[in-house]
Structures are given as C-alpha cells and as structure tokens.
C-alpha cells in the first residue's frame, strides 16, 4: 500500500481558538507569519487548513461556498466553464466600449467574480471534498490554452501552485527550484504565470531563460504568446506590435500617428493607458539579464546547461535582478529534470540542495534564496490520473476511469517498477529512466555508469533499498559524550536529531568501553570485532568558510561475538567549529566501540591527539609495511600516507571489492550498507580528485583496517644449495669414480 509523503496537513500547528479569533476579524495577513512560523497565502484575512509541503508550512484560505458542479458526489470534479456566448465574440476592450451600458451592466458581476477568483483563488467540490486552488492555478485551468486545449486538473499541480504562492508571499524567498519529471507541465504552468502576472503589472519586465536560446524562443512563441492571445478581453491589456511577436510581448499603448488632417483639424489622439510591461527571452549565458530589473524570471530546463554555460554562475547574476538592496522585488520560477552530472546536472544538484528550507542563514534565507520542491513521478505520470485529478498509486480492485476517459486497471507504482525491471540489464538506460521519471531525489540525480569507477548498478540498488520506508528507522543520529563530562572515563552515546554521528549498531553493554592497559599504553579490546577508518583535517577554520569535512567510518569483520559481520555501522561526516571537537569525537567513538583506527597521517594532529592522551595503541600502523621499515613519524603516531600510488590503488580496490560483495542485491538478499551519503560519494568517486571525497577515503580505510592481513608484505623464500664438503661417487661398474 503506497503511503504518500509529499505533503501533510497540520491540524494542531496553530490552536483552533487562535485561528477562530483572528478569522473573526479578518486579521491574518498575506505573507510570512513569524509568530506561528507559517506562510499565509490567504488574501481574505481568514485561514483554514495548514499544509506542510517539503518542510514549508503554508496556511490556506478558509473555504466558503465551494462551487459544486453537481449534487452527486461522483459527478463533482473540475470542469472548465466556457465564457458566455455574448462575451465570446468580444476580442478587446475597444469592442467592449462600443456596447451600450445596459449590456455592460448585465456582465459586470461575472467579470468582477473572475477578477476575484484570480486574486483570491477558487474552491470547488472534488469527489465530495472541498478543494482550494490558488488564483494562479485558477487562471491556468480556466483561461490558459495549452497544446491539448484546456489543462486538466491534477492534484500534483494544485500542490505545486500552493507551494509557488507561498514562495511569492514569503518576503525572504526569491522563488522556487523545482526538481521535476518529464511531461509534468512545468513549461505551460510557468508560461501561464508569466502572462497572468504580466497582465496585471505596470512598468515591469518579465524574462525567460532555458538550456539554449532556441528553447527559450520556442517557449515564448509556442506557449506564452498563445496563452496571452486567448485571454478573454477583460483580462487582456492593450498590446503593442504584432499579435504573435517573436522576441517581445509588449503590453503598452502603440505610438499614435499624427496625420496632416489631424493636425489641421486640431484633433487630439485618443488618450489610452497601457501597462508598459514586457515579456521577452534571452540567449543562454552566465550573464543573461545582467543589470536588468525583473519582476518574474522563468528558468526552464535549468538542470541541462552544458559547458561553458553554468546555471550556478547565471543564478548569482540573475538573483541581483530580483532585488533592490535587501528587498526582494521579483521572483524566479525555476524547474527542470536533471541531466547526467557532468552534463549540467551537478550544478543544478548543488543549486537544488542549496535551496533547502530547513537550512537558512541569519537573514532567514536559504543559501540560494530559492525554495526547493520535488514532486515524485507517481503524482503526475500520464495515463494514471483519475477523473478527479488524483493519481492511481496502487493497482485498483476494479478498473478506474482516467481523466482521459480510458480505464486504469493497474497502479502507477507497478507500471514504474515494470519499466525499471525491464532495464536492469541496461545500466545507462535505467539511470536515464530514473532521471526522467524519478520517485526520489536520488533517482533524479542518477549519473551515467560509464563515468564511475565502481559498480553503480549495485550502489543504486542499495540506495533504492535504503529509501524504502521499511529501512528508514535503522539509523540513529546522535553524539558521544564522556560520562559526567570527565575525560578518559566511560563514553556514552546520546541520540540527538542534530548529532554528528549516524549509527546502525552499538555493541552489547559488556563489549562497550573495553580498554586494555599494557606497557603504560591503552589498547582497544575489540580489535577482533572491527575497526575504524578516518580522513581527518588539521585546521579549525578556512578563509572561504568551506574546507573538507572530517570523516569517520566504523566497520565490523567476521567474529564470533554478538556483532554483525562485514557491516558498516557508523558514519561521521562533519566539520565542527574547532578541530579539537573533531579529534575528541573520533577518540570517543574508538573508545566506546573498543576498536582501533587507521587514519591518514598526512594531517597528523588527530594522531598526535591520540598519542598525547595515551591512546597510541588505538592508532594502527600502516598494514603494507613491517614495523622495521616504518619511518620515525609512523612509528611514533601510526597512520597511513595518502600519497603513495600503491596505497591509492589498494584503497580503491578495497572499496570496489566491498561493493561487489556486500552492497546491493547479493545471493542472500540486500546488503547492510545503510549510509546514503557514503553510497552517493562512492557513486561519484574520482580517483584523480580524492580530496573531494572524504566519505570514500575514510570508508576505504575502514575496509583496509578490517582486512589488514591482505596488505602484509610477504618475503620471498629462496632456497640456496650450500656445499657441505662431502665427495660424491658414481658406483656403476666395478670401480667407483668421483663425481666432479
């Protein structure tokens, strides 16, 4: 049974008594409400349900007098209402002005209601459920012409437009970064919003960018212009130029021509007011729209910018087009599927994750200024939407009538899985399908297998398995602390949602904090169970505020103890405020589990920290050399260098073997590697740029530490014949002869 996680309703986010009191006096203001940490998209002063979409809390308007298409529940669904025939033939405000006042009075209420729906939104009964759509969504459904005629109502689009309205309402937000699947309708929806906003804005500019200038032009000529052309006369402002322009759609008064006759008769040209607003498109480039002020920028196909164009560089430029000082005056509607990572997908991925609403700076903004939204493919896949716009997730007991009139006899999840199973033997084809029709964010950013050093098929099998809800509770986040805050006593693990450690297993109590003392040195008591690998750092701060993170991984090996065999059980990828905090974190983990650590010694402060505290016995020596051949520093603090080509190759081979044997689908089931960040780092590992892969370095060292015997050098045994001084005789015949 499919359980959706795209959104949830929060019935208790604000006390009902507070909502009723504020509703009574229409006191809820459109925008961000800091007191209740919610974005209010109601323009009536009243709020109803509160949605949470991708961690963004949004208060919807209170729905009164919802429209009913029919009194029967099963006949209640969205249906575009045709414009009255008397108004259908009126093409412009000039035609309207020619009609008598009696005719106009008849239609003023109808026109006023349409403007009200455009401003405040619209609610209707959908299969017996009152359903709210924003004003922008209403304009898309009711008055926008797309390639198939009238758009269908889809629940996924409703949630999209609610999220978009929240982006517009929030003064901290520059817009949205929408990670989509193919044929989701984003190009038409964003085109409809361009026309909707441009036709009610004065002295404004609206822009379009895409993966190439030709694509931006096509979007303008084939989507934006037809939508504008088919608007009813009461929404259509005065337009300058051609009816179907190629480069710019201008809502302004055309220049009046003064003829000799008009001048001689002193006839004044008719005074008209225009919006002085334009919609245009630009060629793709890092500096497109540089220095211009925009009210809305539509960024289509932003995950497909090929070199030398860079979406990150362009966003840094166009972001300034949407603000005056600290005040945000425009918004960006960005959306795309993702190309392979080296074909523009990597930059879009960085931009998407920089738009996480849970990670804000002190100004309350995300790193990019945008808000990220991902709608899984099952919400908008063609052929699996019922009459009410709701996806058919699971296979129904009886066929369901689709929005296109065809019957749906099995669910979209089953269909998607069948497609995936059919592509199992074609890794690149499978990953392309994942990128086009993703069910998770990880699917959307799948890379091409030919670019990876390791077996991407098995890595992604494990990632998909981990994403299953059944495996979501295996990992626990938390921190290690000394008992009572006293160093060198017992270490205790405390769960903490903001902790730096992720663990999947802790040893039984009798195996915790096992420390052996010998020769005035402390040694780990559980070396036979497993070991740690670590990629440390030495400097607390960096000039750019970035720097690589410290990484630590714990892995078990085969043992007779009560512990899982050959399993990663700990992941630490973090950069605390000071290096000393990191050193102590690593030390406490080693002591709690009672296991040694194999760390890179090129940055030796961590290992000196171990030695200074009396834990030199926990630091493993490099396994590829006997003790007699170690350098003086290696004898003092242990560790392994990362500069040797032999070590680099052995390290990569260790990860490769681990993936083949213990990751993804194996003979006994799926692997037990539950750490997604490490799996994703393995997937994009580049052996020529190892410094960018902290998780891969430390996890590989953990594997080597658990299999140290494989790397022990073996001396060649040479058998040499040594003469002992005895003569040898040939006794054939009657006389013995000396053998020379």
Residue spans of the language-model regions?
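Residue-level preference for the first positions of well-ordered beta-strands
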Residues: 175-177, 205-207, 296, 596
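Substrate-engagement module of ASCE P-loop NTPases
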Residues: 316-329, 335
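Short alpha-helix plus adjacent loop in nuclease-associated cores
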Residues: 619-665
